[in-house]
Amino acid sequence: STFLRCLNLLEIPTSGKISVSGELIRMKKDRYGETFPEDNKQVERLRTRLGMVFQQFNLWSHMTVLENVIEAPVHVLKTPKKEALEQAEAILHKVGIFERKDYHPGHLSGGQQQRVAIARALAMEPDMLLFDEPTSALDPELVGEVLRVMRQLAEEGRTMIVVTHEMGFAREVSSRVVFL
């Protein structure tokens, strides 16, 4: 989890280097020795290229599924709302949650909420998806529906970094497995 949070600079690493898609993230130290990003615009660019799916979903409870998915494309990427809605509906179909597009997160199961979180990340058209234990907060019977979506993304050739305890899944869909 800390590794993923360092990749998108939600946590600032104290040493080492981060390179995403060949771009080295420039860091510097202040007069107290604290590390911080040298260029905030570079950090913004990085974050639009990395889709993060959190363990606890982090959906906005006051928004519908559809509103959750279009929020970032409309406000960050400046995608026209009509285009964002069309894209979001296609993604919701893909992750198998379209029929719940007008529901609020509190009316969804954990597996459904996690699929919405995946859809929200996909809506930003990221170069890479970061999954922070995407099934650990789910009831065992709901794990399969989330793994199915992730397996489909892997089969499409999506670059994903997944922190998981689902070792069988990791071995099955990964090109490389790293134990930390």
Listing of model-derived features with the role each one plays in the protein:
Residues 63-71:
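Short coil-to-helix segment of the ABC ATPase nucleotide-binding domain corresponding to the Q-loop/switch region
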Residues 16-31:
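Conserved ABC transporter NBD signature motif
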Residues 129-132:
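Catalytic Walker B motif of ABC-type/P-loop ATPase nucleotide-binding domains
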Residues 164-165:
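H-loop/switch region of ABC-family ATPase nucleotide-binding domains
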Residues 140-142:
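Helix N-cap at the start of a conserved alpha-helix in ABC-type nucleotide-binding domains
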Residues 104-108, 112:
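Conserved ABC ATPase signature
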Residues 103, 124, 156:
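Conserved signature/switch motifs of ABC ATPase nucleotide-binding domains
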